[in-house]
């Protein structure tokens, strides 16, 4: 039986170190062909996209023995080919495994966004798995229904941090159903 795992982590938090060590040991015990390290990283955007924080976080992971296989780069705009090559070069992650993690209206759009970038094929190839072409039409229809509802319902909730939308993101997502 093969075990497969993926991990994304904030390398700056000390409380995450035991988990990072656990995934490092998992890969050691089960091999590269049975594990996949996915690092979610923020591309800081000011007047231009900054890649230094991503390079730094990958460097910190490497210091503890973890080399990410895939980078999901959180950004509001797609990475240019030049930036993707630069990130690939300085993080030692294959260029096709440097993926945009763009802002989406609904979390349900994320799998479609990643599939459009070929992330499913990248994962399957890395793990040497055969997969058939995904049948995404039901998922696409679900996303379309969520984005274009036929009816509306007003729901109000009281909270301390209602001005900060992210504070209640999980509740907002749950209420969409």
PLM regions and their residue ranges:
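Conserved alpha/beta core surface patches that mediate binding of polyanionic ligands
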Residues: 20-24, 50, 135-141
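Phosphate-binding active sites in nucleotide-utilizing proteins
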Residues: 144, 153-177
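Short histidine/acidic/glycine/proline-rich micro-motifs that form metal-
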Residues: 10, 44-45, 77, 161-163
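Structured alpha-helical segments in the cores of large, soluble enzyme domains
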Residues: 19-34, 53-60, 175
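Glycine-/acidic-rich phosphate or pyrophosphate-binding loops and their flanking alpha/beta elements
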Residues: 132-154
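Single conserved hydrophobic/aromatic residue that forms the stacking wall/gate
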Residues: 1-8, 12
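Internal gly/pro-rich beta-alpha loop/helix module
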Residues: 35-130, 143-146
């Amino acid at each position: 039986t093969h075990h497969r795992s993926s991990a994304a982590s904030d390398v700056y938090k000390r409380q995450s170190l035991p988990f990072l060590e656990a995934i490092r040991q998992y890969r050691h015990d089960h091999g590269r062909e049975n594990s996949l390290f996915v690092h979610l990283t923020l591309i800081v955007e000011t007047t231009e996209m900054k890649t230094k924080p991503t390079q730094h976080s990958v460097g910190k992971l490497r210091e503890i023995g973890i080399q990410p296989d895939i980078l999901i780069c959180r950004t509001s705009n797609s990475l240019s080919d030049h930036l993707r090559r630069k990130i690939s070069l300085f993080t030692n992650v294959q260029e096709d495994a440097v993926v945009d993690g763009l802002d989406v209206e609904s979390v349900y759009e994320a799998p479609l966004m990643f599939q459009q970038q070929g992330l499913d094929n990248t994962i399957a190839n890395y793990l040497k798995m055969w997969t058939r072409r995904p049948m995404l039409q039901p998922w696409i229809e679900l996303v379309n229904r969520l984005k274009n509802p036929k009816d509306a319902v007003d729901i109000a909730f009281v909270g301390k941090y209602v001005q900060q939308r992210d504070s209640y993101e999980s509740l907002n997502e749950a209420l969409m159903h």
